[in-house]
């Protein structure tokens, strides 16, 4: 049984869980196959729907997502809602699922998602991605932002992602992915879904 840590660095609750290696490998293999085929890559291009200033954003087929990932996501959304408000979710509808390929100097500006619940999972990360001469090492990390800083209340939560991290959060929670200076690919997936709010 995979551990889930649910916490609120500010108002909204955020959950972090580890993705099984089997799922990571399946997604990476599928993305590599798409990238190696120009016609598939063109059909799968999802960048026009997103704000990311990155090389490639790829939509995976519903067939692939349903077969390899959906069960894991739904299970953990149910756990997340149960831990947050102690209620059982009856309906979960996955609206979108895509993969982001981020390279040196690319970034994702501050944004929020649609749906009710969103998530991000990390599939590949360059070595020493946060390396910097600065004291605050945010290169390649993700910031979650809510409200403004006040006494005894933070407005920022910074996460330095590791391969296999999956973060679940309310869709309205603003976030940004910082650029990095290292060679290599930071590969992640994101998703949006709706739940039955009557739970």
What positions do the PLM features span?
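Short beta-strand micro-motifs in enzyme catalytic cores
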Residues: 13-15, 185-189
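Preference for bulky hydrophobic residues occupying beta-strand positions
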Residues: 17, 121, 191-193
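A structural signal for short hydrophobic/aromatic patches embedded in well-ordered alpha helices
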Residues: 27-31, 177, 189
């Amino acid at each position: 049984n995979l551990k889930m840590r649910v916490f609120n660095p500010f108002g909204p609750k955020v959950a972090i869980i580890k993705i099984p290696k089997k799922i990571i490998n399946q997604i990476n293999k599928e993305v590599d196959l798409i990238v190696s085929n120009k016609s598939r890559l063109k059909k799968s291009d999802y960048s026009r729907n997103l704000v990311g200033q990155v090389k490639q954003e790829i939509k995976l087929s519903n067939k692939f997502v349903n077969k390899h990932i959906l069960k894991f996501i739904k299970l953990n959304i149910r756990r997340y809602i149960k831990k947050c408000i102690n209620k059982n979710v009856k309906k979960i509808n996955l609206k979108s699922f895509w993969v982001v390929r981020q390279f040196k100097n690319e970034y994702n500006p501050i944004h929020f998602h649609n749906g009710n619940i969103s998530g991000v999972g990390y599939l590949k990360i360059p070595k020493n991605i946060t390396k910097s001469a600065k004291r605050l090492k945010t290169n390649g990390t993700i910031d979650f932002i809510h409200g403004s800083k006040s006494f005894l209340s933070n407005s920022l939560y910074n996460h330095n992602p590791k391969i296999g991290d999956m973060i679940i959060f309310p869709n309205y929670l603003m976030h940004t992915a910082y650029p990095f200076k290292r060679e290599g690919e930071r590969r992640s997936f994101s998703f949006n879904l709706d739940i039955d709010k009557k739970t």
